[in-house]
Amino acid sequence: MKKLFFLLITLYVFTACQSKYNDVPDTYHTLLDSALIKANSNAPQILKALTDAPKNQKEGMAFLISYMPKRDLTTLSASFLLENAAYAYKTREKYPWSKALPDSIFFNEVLPYTNVAETRDPWRKDFYERFSKYVEDKTNLKDAIFAIANPIKDEVKVEYNVKRSKVDSSPKEAMAENMATCTGLSIILTDAFRSVGIPSRLAGTPMWTNMKGNHTWSEVFIDNEWKFIEYYPEDLNKSWFLADAGKADPNNPLHWIYAVSYKPTNQYYYAGRAVKHLINKMDVNDMPAQMRKGYENSKKHDSISEGPYIYGVNVTQRYIDLYEKSLKGKKLEEDELIASFIIFKDKDIAKSDSRLDCRVDIFMEDEKIDFGYSPSATDDMNKFLKLKLKKNTNYTVMVSNTKNNIEHSFSISTDDNATQEFKLIL
């Protein structure tokens, strides 16, 4: 009986779709066939969404359906999808920043109804009605971004609170409780941006390199690049966590910075999969004290449970570059300097292959002052790890690389200049 039902569904999809793909680019046809088979008994609803979508919305609807997680293919109604698309396209017609977007950005970072694993609430219409009034007189995208971000907590009446019932709460769930963690707050902020045609996505890390837990925030696409912003905003690309993000380890997925993609990529968004894969294999009792504390903090405060269908992009290097740029722009105190570090495995320091990517910890007597990661053999030869230190001071530098079984210490002394380079040879 099951086999017969599957064959009937397959036949239904095949015959129905032949006349329904007329306004959809050929590149989606095979993907749509596959999606409708996965939808099983919900295939008529999914097909109705595609069929009833206005001609100018067909490709966007095809994009959503083609890359839709199975959990949504089997449950979402045509009315849910049609309303979501209608309001997304309404913003594209209304706002200059949305009208100017390439399809690839509009489809992937404005049109989607979801971010990670939150409940699929129909938030789009409600949020458009809530937030469109804030951008009515805006013609500049940055002004529009902050016209949403500045009043958002007062509009939705949601504050950060770890007592929330869920980590990845939907806007409706967070607003019912008046609380959310950073994941829930970021979902609200990203959905608010999308509701007025501003491309936005979630970003975050499974675990900071200082092992103090994880974090999630939002990104917006402005001036043809992605910039980060928080629910409690300071400015674009400015927040308390930049120093932590800038010290991410580009060689360890546990410490990468990830951004969410609706369209499948070649890797998953962190959403706990990196945490589970790289940490949960360990016995918690065997973890170093700092890692164990960070792991427990991560479980308490943010998500380590989202599903395997959430895709991501590795944006680690962009955050490292942003942090290094911020250091250059900082005014140094009279007794401070910027120290640049690079680690070599041999004395041939002119060769790119001699460089080693290592963790570099700086100590003054027994107190750890700072840390970071030195450039690898494939990085630009002008790239250094930059740290702010005191002038005319003695330090101990601990260099480690577990993959290559390296652990070495150096004694260094800073001088009286504003900058100083340290090329350390193992």
Give the residues covered by each predicted segment.
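Cysteine-centered nucleophilic/redox motifs
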Residues: 148, 178-203, 218
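Bacterial signal peptide processing site
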Residues: 18-20
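His-Asp-centered catalytic microenvironments across diverse enzyme cores
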Residues: 161-162, 195, 203-216, 220-381, ...
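Sec-dependent signal peptide recognition
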Residues: 2-7
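Secondary-structure boundary elements
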Residues: 45-48, 53-178, 265-266, 271-272, ...
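C-terminal motif of bacterial Sec signal peptides marking the signal peptidase cleavage site
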Residues: 13-16
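A short, solvent-exposed beta-strand micro-motif common in secreted/extracellular proteins
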Residues: 391-403
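Structured interaction patches on ligand/partner-binding surfaces of diverse proteins
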Residues: 402-426
